[in-house]
């Protein structure tokens, strides 16, 4: 990561800012880059996605903010992954439409505390050669990620 940032800094020292760009009208490159890296960010998550067994109730609000990992890694073979987690409580109004009652209660949600770029697991296809039975057993190369059309 440090080597990449150094290369970018050297590139800008050699080339300067892109022509036609007035600083202040566009977000500077380093700020764009820093905001895009793999890190924890405040995200909205649906309560029902986090607690799918609670479909008999309505919740207000229907989603909550928690810190989750997100952002780009320097290589497409890597994915921004949570390496640390904790449980956090959020006050929610639970509505029971059958009984026409509601109450405020604390529900627990998983929040990410640390993130890291790690190799993607479960790749669709490893790109290994496969035998093509229609061509008399000849080997054919299957591009990565392509399994059907």
Swiss-Prot record:
Q: Where is this region: Disordered?
A: 118-149
Q: Which residues carry this modification: Pyrrolidone carboxylic acid?
A: 25
Q: Name one GO cellular component term.
A: extracellular space
Q: Which Gene Ontology biological process is one annotated for this entry?
A: sprouting angiogenesis
What would be an example GO MF term here?
Answer: chemoattractant activity
Signal peptide feature range:
1-24
Say what the protein does: Snake venom VEGFs that may contribute to venom dispersion and prey subjugation by inducing vascular permeability and hypotension. This protein induces an increase in capillary permeability after intradermal injection, as well as a drastic hypotensive effect after intravenous injection. The hypotension is mediated by nitric oxide (NO), which is produced by VEGF-activated endothelium NO synthase. Also induces angiogenesis in vitro. Like other crotalid VEGFs, this protein interacts with VEGF receptor-1 (FLT1) with a high affinity, whereas it binds to VEGF receptor-2 (KDR) with a low affinity.
Question: What is this protein identified as?
Answer: Snake venom vascular endothelial growth factor toxin 2
Please give the organism: Sistrurus catenatus edwardsii (Desert massasauga)
